[in-house]
């Protein structure tokens, strides 16, 4: 299974109301990025990242440039598994974890689909019967 196309959508998400954060910061619109990795086998892997630059050490408008920089290392490579492709990307572009995270999610999605297993199984399996939230 090899990735033969990368598509990235950038979308502004506007809240119905202003969101109030710590330190008096507010946010009413954030930019999110949705990535699709198409493969020669017909499978698609999806990822999404929504960096909020005034809250996190990330720059949303830098994601498309980072994906363009990393694309040659992604397209054409065997993508069965996640660790080796992500290590390869570290050699192409240092840092930029927010931009790499969208690729990481899409690779995990592909890995799960290709292996026919749920993502939680690939990440170590179910460890509890239920999960209390609060």
Language-model features, listed with the residues they occupy:
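Generic marker of residues within folded, mature protein domains
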Residues: 25-27, 93, 123
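Hydrophobic faces of well-ordered beta-strands that scaffold small-molecule active sites
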Residues: 45-47, 129-134
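Structured beta-strand/loop patches that form or line metal/cofactor-binding pockets in enzymes
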Residues: 1-46, 50-57
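Acidic/polar active-site rim loop that often engages polyanionic ligands
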Residues: 66-68, 128-131
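Short capping/connector residues at structural and topological boundaries
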Residues: 16, 24, 79, 124-128
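Metal- or metallocofactor-binding catalytic centers and their adjacent structured scaffolds
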Residues: 5, 38-114
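Broad gene-expression machinery/nucleic-acid interaction feature
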Residues: 32-34, 102, 130-132
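N-terminal amphipathic alpha-helix/helix-capping segment at the start of soluble metabolic enzymes
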Residues: 1-13, 87-91, 113, 117-130
């Amino acid at each position: 299974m090899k990735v033969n196309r990368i598509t990235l959508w950038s979308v502004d998400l506007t809240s119905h109301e202003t969101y109030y954060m710590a330190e008096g910061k507010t946010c009413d619109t954030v930019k999110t990025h949705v990535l699709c990795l198409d493969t020669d086998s017909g499978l698609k892997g999806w990822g999404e990242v929504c960096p909020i630059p005034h809250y996190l050490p990330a720059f949303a408008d830098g994601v498309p440039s980072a994906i363009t920089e990393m694309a040659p290392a992604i397209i054409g490579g065997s993508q069965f598994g996640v660790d080796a492709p992500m290590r390869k990307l570290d050699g192409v572009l240092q840092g930029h974890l927010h931009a790499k995270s969208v690729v990481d999610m899409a690779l995990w999605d592909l890995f799960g689909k290709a292996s026919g297993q749920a993502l939680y199984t690939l990440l170590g399996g179910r460890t509890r019967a239920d999960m209390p939230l609060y």
